[in-house]
Swiss-Prot record:
CDD domains referenced in this protein's UniProt entry, alphabetically: NT_2-5OAS_ClassI-CCAase
The species this protein was found in: Halobacterium salinarum (strain ATCC 700922 / JCM 11081 / NRC-1)
Binding site for ATP: S54, R57, H140, K160, Y169
PANTHER family reported in the protein's UniProt record: CCA-ADDING ENZYME
Keyword RNA-binding: yes
Protein name: CCA-adding enzyme
Length: 452
């Protein structure tokens, strides 16, 4: 047995559900289905129940306790009635559950220790005819039930655990990683987990995988996996370029040096105030934090706005002459844009380079603009033959920028409204430590010890 095979066998023992787990889940799903069918029988419309997701396809990892049931209603049913009937069935099946809202309401709750979602959808003839995003999910289950055998399903579990171990599992907009469905499609496409790693090692983004050979739509993403049930959809659309590269890095490392560590999420060492101060002192950089109460929106709406705000702040700082080492954005009860700077203060003057003297009218206009300005040094000609002036900076400190200039940079909508009202705080240097700990201890611990 090779080193890789030995490691994989040990991981299989961790991720494969036991026969008892399988029987218990199947029994619970059966009882839930019976409840749903009984509730449907009381409705004035026909509908059926299908189990979807990893537990329906046999690709769930040991310890997962999720059951997803979809109630399919006629495609001509008005949306309002679909929502009403769907939540009626959900309440009957999960009397202690509660409603949540995606594209339309569904009921979530617990049953015999399992987390259960009961979701109404339309019974359409094909995924290309969907009336709501969830309508395509049953087609995913059908497709994979036709293409997965027990061996491939077991390899999907390995794939999921591998991606969890390296921190890129999850299609939420915070993680920007790989969904369970994407894992399944990749394992099917390449014929197994090890073959998938070998293929990933050789990826040259943009990577395009078209399982059903649709060859219809084009996508502008680093990884494209065309949904075999819907040629207009890229299953990997949410996966960031950084996470594509991270998977490649770990695929290469595992194939070179197999280790169970690849399947185990890293746990950063605890970080207290003294350790954070020591890290900052050792790097001789200056941290800056813009902190505000987290907007009351779901994570998939919040994080794109946070990431846009982070990028806008970084771009604004750089445009004002600051050297940004690295930046991040986090949210809990509060939201944070965190920026590490080479220096938090700049010289009183900045160099403003104009056009080459040789370009005539444009150069003359630059010269005349500053020729009689007593507030600048110059204009003079530099060694490259360009006009240059040295002028006073509008903003000399990073803290000053964050307090007065945030309204000029691109921010997420909810962040922008808080900034416009002045409802945010700015911390620079040592003040960041007390402001962010202990609320953001895990995020800061990962930040100070970055790993691919």
């Amino acid at each position: 047995m090779t080193d890789a095979a030995a490691v994989i066998e040990r991981v299989r023992q961790r991720v494969d559900p036991t026969p008892a787990e399988r029987r218990a889940l199947a029994a619970a799903a059966s009882r839930l289905t019976e409840r749903a069918e009984a509730a449907i029988a009381e409705l004035p419309v026909a509908a059926d129940v299908v189990q979807v997701g990893s537990t329906a396809r046999g690709t769930w990892v040991a310890g997962d306790r999720d059951i997803d049931l979809f109630v399919r209603f006629p495609s001509d049913l008005p949306r309002e009635q679909l929502e009403t009937y769907g939540t009626t069935v959900g309440a009957a099946v999960l009397p202690d559950g509660h409603e949540e809202y995606a594209e339309h309401p569904y009921v979530t709750g617990t049953f015999e220790g399992y987390a259960v979602d009961l979701v109404p959808c339309y019974d359409v003839a094909a995924a290309t005819e969907i009336k709501s995003a969830v309508d395509r999910t049953p087609f995913h289950t059908t497709y994979l039930q036709e293409h997965l055998d027990d061996g491939l399903a077991a390899d999907v579990r390995l794939c999921k655990q591998f991606l969890k171990g390296i921190g890129v599992y999850g299609s939420d907009l915070r993680t920007q990683g790989f969904s369970g469905y994407l894992c399944e499609l990749l394992v099917v496409e390449y014929g197994g987990f090890e073959a998938m790693l070998a293929a990933i090692e050789d990826w040259q983004p943009p990577v395009v995988i078209d399982p059903a050979a649709h060859q219809q739509a084009s996508f502008d993403d680093p990884l494209v996996v065309v949904d075999p049930t819907d040629p207009e959809r890229n299953v990997a659309a949410v996966v960031s370029a950084a996470n594509v590269a991270t998977v490649q890095h770990h695929a290469r490392r595992f194939r070179a040096t197999p280790s169970e560590d690849a399947f185990t999420p890293a746990s950063p060492a605890p970080l207290d105030a003294a350790a954070l101060r020591s890290h900052i002192d050792r790097r001789d950089t200056t941290p800056l934090a813009v902190v505000l109460d987290a907007p009351d929106v779901v994570a998939d709406q919040l994080y794109p706005q946070l990431y846009r705000s982070r990028d806008g702040v970084v771009r604004g700082l750089r445009e004002h002459g600051f050297d940004v080492v690295r930046a991040a954005a986090w949210a809990d009860e509060r939201a944070v844009v965190f920026v590490e700077l080479a220096s938090a203060e700049l010289p009183a003057v900045e160099r403003h380079v104009g056009p080459p003297v040789s370009v005539g009218t444009h150069a003359e206009r630059f010269y005349e603009t500053y020729a009689d300005d007593d507030g600048v040094y110059g204009p003079f000609v530099d060694d490259d033959g360009r006009y240059v002036v040295e002028r006073d900076r509008d903003v000399r400190t990073a803290g000053g920028f964050a307090r007065t200039e945030l309204g000029t940079v691109a921010l997420g909508a909810r962040i922008e409204s808080r900034v416009a009202s002045g409802d945010y705080d700015v911390y620079v240097g040592d003040a960041v430590v007390e402001a962010l700990l202990p609320e953001f201890e895990s995020e800061l611990a990962a930040y100070v010890d970055p790993k691919a």
